[in-house]
Amino acid sequence: MCNQPHFSKSFASLHPDAFDAVIVAGGDFPTHHVPLAVMERARMLVACDSAGEELVRRGYKPTAIVGDCDSMSAEFRAAHADIIYKVEEQDYNDLTKATRFCTERGCRRIAYVGATGKREDHTLGNISLLDFYSRELYVDALMLTDYGVFIPAAGETAIRTFAGQQISIFNLSCTRIDGDGLRWQPYAFSALWQGTLNEALGESVTLRGDGNYIVYAAYKL
């Protein structure tokens, strides 16, 4: 059983052991060492539908495969029937079905990998779902890509950074945003592009907003 508490919005590290569960979606399979390390150390490794086949093909052993099962071969479904959880309702996508599967088992700190790449509409939808998971499902979520991490946030958020780290802020509902530790002072951006390509000055960035926003922090090259 995973941990029960809802963690505070202060992301001190991307330590591979920091998560209750890792959800693998059907986008580009990770190649960067950060998401790969998180997957290797996952306490619960949950695949979204066809991502289960990809995981098994690459030698991983998923805890569960969740979705409507419309993208898996009949042979694979038969061979892995004991870990497949079919959810047929169409109100939510497979990423959300997998998230609910994890939260119903007490998981709150969830890392998402393979959620970007391939179809751009899926990428945008998956990133935006981070805010929904944070607000409605009380998940402390991070979405790890091969280039950086997306962090859903609200109110005050502290992030450990390094000097020169590229930081982008996507305002969702704030009428006020300010912060410390960035080269350019953030504000309540009215368009998504306005908050991109900021830069951390040192070892931490603190953001304060009166609503919800998503932060992107690039990895160190």
Model-identified regions with their sequence ranges:
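SAM-dependent methyltransferases
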Residues: 1-19, 204-221
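N-terminal beta-strand-loop-alpha-helix module at the start
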Residues: 2-77
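Structural motif
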Residues: 20-22, 43-44, 63-64, 82-83, ...
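Short beta-strand segments
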Residues: 23-25, 49, 113-115, 144-145, ...
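Short acidic/polar capping segments at secondary-structure boundaries
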Residues: 28-29, 52, 71, 116-117, ...
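Acidic/Gly/His-enriched mid-domain segments of enzyme catalytic cores or analogous surface patches
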Residues: 41, 50-136
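Class I SAM-dependent methyltransferase SAM-binding "motif I" and its flanking Rossmann-like core
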Residues: 132-161
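Long, charged alpha-helical interface segments
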Residues: 153-221
